[in-house]
Amino acid sequence: MKDRDGSLPEIPSSRGDDIHNIQYMDSADLVLFMAGNQFMVMDDLLSRFRQIYPDVKRIFYETLPPGLELRQILAGGAVFQDKVIDTVPDIYTSVTEEAMKELSVKGRVNEYFIYLHNRLALMVSEGNPCNIKSVKDLGRDDIRISQPGRLEDIAHYITAMYRKAGGDELVRKILEQKKADGTTVFTTVHHRETPQRITRGLADVGPVWATEVVNAQKDGLRVEAVEPGEEFDQRDSVNYFIARLADAPNPGNAEKFLDFIKSPEAQEIYRQHGFVPHFA
């Protein structure tokens, strides 16, 4: 499935940090298309995986939005800068079951399962100078919001959080009225743009994955989290799905990775980065 004009989907040139070990693209022992908001886990995760499976040396992986990775799989490749990446992944992960269902219908995956969960948090500057205490506070006229764009996978969970906290009125206030007023500013890559805006004083708050607050703090950024509360943070809705592609070029190594991702060691690595493990 190429894009509507028949071309391969294009990976924005600015996403170079999400293409890892491209030199192994055609000779990899394992190819992973990981939902992008796991980017902060991958070094620790793959370091431990390689210790357990030292024969899996060359790992090419992407940490792009899973919707873009899905288009890449269905189109048979994607264009990145001056290269065509047409490698079939061994493993694909997504935060929506719809993506897995589409791949299943088209015969690209046979089985998939949930392996992880996440939750939402409100990222604010250290000390919470605007005294933001709840999701409803984002409707205040004086609060500047760094809001993930609708094409980002986190966006519909955030909208659900707003609706749960304040109904359609709060959704309209934040996404329409405050956008028109200039106090809701949308992002393209929220996990980079939101921490930058907050630390530079360009935004007061940004709804993000809780894991992204943990990562920003590990990077030394002076931010903290305001917890929406379990009733609102979507933890029961945010599921991460994983599957081996039916035509995986390295099926044996793909199975090793699937076994590893369920292991207590892998789940603990995710927990340390703020995720909610599925296999307790």
Name the predicted role of every residue range:
Residues 90:
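Catalytic metal-binding acidic patch
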Residues 73-75:
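Glycine/small-residue-rich interface belts in oligomeric ring/scaffold proteins
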Residues 113:
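Conserved, well-structured beta-alpha core segment at the onset of a catalytic domain
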